[in-house]
């Protein structure tokens, strides 16, 4: 497998943190060119702070972290402290970061990196609202054909919504941004709730993280201890779904995932279904496919990979 050059666009978030750790623990497959923070689970000052905390937890204070957009394109920001806590990384007690944010805006970093790197070599990995990505596409459309692909966490169809009856949080926060990305023509792989709700941290899986006996393993276990309470109370699930790590795991082990290439459109007008990812699973619309919609994962294989990689940190 060729080395994947990626930019992680993120709003940490406990599951974002695990995704970052997985990427930084996998240098044979993944080269992280930089991390851009976006407002989402918590406001931008906290997501930018949390991204640096996680880099230091992984032993990578050299990683370039940039602050991006602090609000959606045209709507007030909606956050998810009720899920992730006031800091966004509630659970473990982690030291404040000592590494500095890079001075450049995250969107400028995305644009400049895609213009500089060889065409077709960079994958964008958005783990939060798509505001930074859409802004980059809008301001510099020349970068779109230079992408390898966009592998994102967002959306839902058969699994329905987690912030409204029909919408997944990342898409709902900035549906106009999602519409720009899905209509851009960029190759898209999406990890919707349909697959991420199958990547559940059961007690034995969380015990395996804790049993690693490392700071990263302990932190992930404590993040999950906090994060899982919402899903257990709301959905009666067996544990916390690791949404965002599915993006990184797909880059390392695509064979763990299955999906279907279909048309996905974003609802931006209806107050009833705002932010819905309208997925033409049965190809009845006649619209051209624009996304690989991932629907299933080998959960045991996923957690084996994740545990093995966290053991490196």
PLM segments and residue spans:
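Surface-exposed loop and adjacent secondary-structure segments within mature catalytic domains
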Residues: 66-94
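Conformational coupling and interaction surfaces
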Residues: 2-3, 22-25, 29-31, 172-176, ...
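Short, conserved catalytic or adaptor-binding loops enriched in Gly and charged residues
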Residues: 55-58, 285
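Acidic/polar N-terminal loop/beta-strand segments that form early-domain functional surfaces
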Residues: 37-40, 68-70, 269
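Active-site histidine-anchored catalytic micro-motif
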Residues: 2-53, 61, 87, 93-198, ...
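A residue-level signal for conserved active-site and pocket-lining positions in enzyme catalytic cores
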Residues: 65, 181, 248
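Short, mixed-charge aromatic SLiMs
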Residues: 42-46, 50, 74, 156-160, ...
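A short alpha-helix-loop-beta-strand transition element characteristic
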Residues: 59-66
């Amino acid at each position: 497998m060729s080395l994947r050059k990626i930019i992680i666009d993120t709003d940490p978030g406990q599951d974002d943190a695990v995704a970052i750790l997985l990427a930084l623990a996998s240098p044979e497959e993944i080269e992280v060119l930089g991390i851009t923070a976006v407002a989402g689970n918590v406001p931008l000052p906290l997501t930018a702070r949390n991204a640096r905390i996680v880099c230091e937890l992984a032993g990578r204070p050299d990683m370039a972290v940039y602050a991006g957009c602090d609000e959606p394109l045209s709507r007030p920001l909606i956050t998810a402290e009720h899920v992730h806590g006031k800091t966004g990384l509630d659970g473990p007690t982690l030291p404040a970061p000592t590494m500095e944010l890079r001075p450049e805006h995250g969107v400028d970093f995305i644009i400049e990196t895609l213009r500089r790197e060889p065409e077709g070599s960079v994958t964008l990995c958005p783990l939060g609202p798509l505001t930074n990505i859409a802004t980059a596409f809008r301001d510099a459309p020349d970068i779109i054909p230079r992408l390898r692909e966009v592998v994102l966490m967002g959306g839902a169809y058969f699994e329905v919504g987690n912030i409204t009856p029909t919408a997944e949080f990342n898409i709902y926060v900035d549906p106009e941004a999602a519409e720009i990305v899905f209509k851009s023509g960029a190759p898209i792989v999406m990890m919707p709730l349909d697959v991420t709700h199958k990547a559940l941290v059961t007690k034995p899986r969380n015990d395996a993280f804790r049993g690693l006996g490392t700071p990263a393993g302990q932190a992930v276990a404590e993040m999950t201890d906090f994060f899982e309470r919402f899903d257990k109370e709301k959905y009666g699930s067996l544990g916390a779904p690791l949404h965002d790590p599915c993006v990184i795991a797909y880059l390392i082990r695509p064979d763990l995932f299955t999906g279907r290439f279909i048309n996905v459109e974003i609802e931006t007008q209806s107050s009833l279904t705002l932010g819905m990812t309208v997925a033409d699973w049965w190809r009845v619309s006649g619209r051209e496919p624009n996304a690989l919609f991932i629907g299933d994962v080998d959960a045991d294989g996923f957690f084996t990979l994740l545990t093995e990689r966290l053991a490196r940190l």
